[in-house]
Amino acid sequence: MTEIERKFLVATFPDGELHAVPLRQGYLTTPTDSIELRLRQQGTEYFMTLKSEGGLSRQEYEIQIDVTQFEMLWPATEGRRVEKTRYSGKLPDGQLFELDVFAGHLSPLMLVEVEFLSEDAAQAFIPPPWFGEEVTEDKRYKNKALALSIP
């Protein structure tokens, strides 16, 4: 499946109704690998995700795993982890966004992502005033880099 998204720093936390869920992610690959293999605990659900390289558009495959599989693989992510709270909401035009507030050594970093059905829609998107600088193409803001305390 192709994932098309743009990522921004957050200038100010948005007003409105948001749904929050705690996340922890660990990476089985390093930032220099051409693919990304990630484990994620999202509330009480567990996932393994494979992503290709890319900025605006890249391939993504995700499967749900059980807690036993997650806990068996989690130790292999030591030193390559992030913890955050993900807030989901809608922009005034109905477009969904996901805002991540990072914990621990990455606090007070906040990033917001918006996914699109096409690259044309992504290019036409005008971010609202509470969005900050765009970092879609900046590899330092990929979660696998953040897991190593970069930037």
From Swiss-Prot:
SUPFAM superfamilies: CYTH-like phosphatases. The active site is at Y27 (proton acceptor). Residues 1-148 form the CYTH domain. Optimum pH is around 9.7. Pfam families: CYTH. One of its GO terms (molecular function) is inorganic triphosphate phosphatase activity. Changing K84A: It is 10 times less active than the wild-type and the affinity for PPPi is 2 orders of magnitude lower than for the wild-type. Optimum temperature is between 50 and 55 degrees Celsius. It catalyses: triphosphate + H2O = phosphate + diphosphate. Transmembrane segments: none annotated. Keywords: Hydrolase. The keyword Phosphoprotein does not apply. Its EC number is 3.6.1.25. Activated by magnesium and mangenese ions, and inhibited by calcium, zinc and copper ions. Involved in the hydrolysis of the beta-gamma-phosphoanhydride linkage of triphosphate-containing substrates (inorganic or nucleoside-linked). Catalyzes the hydrolysis of inorganic triphosphate (PPPi). The enzyme has a strong preference for linear PPPi compared with cyclic PPPi (cyclic trimetaphosphate) and to the linear P4. The longer chains polyphosphate are not hydrolyzed. It has only a slight thiamine triphosphatase (ThTPase) activity. Homodimer. This is Inorganic triphosphatase.
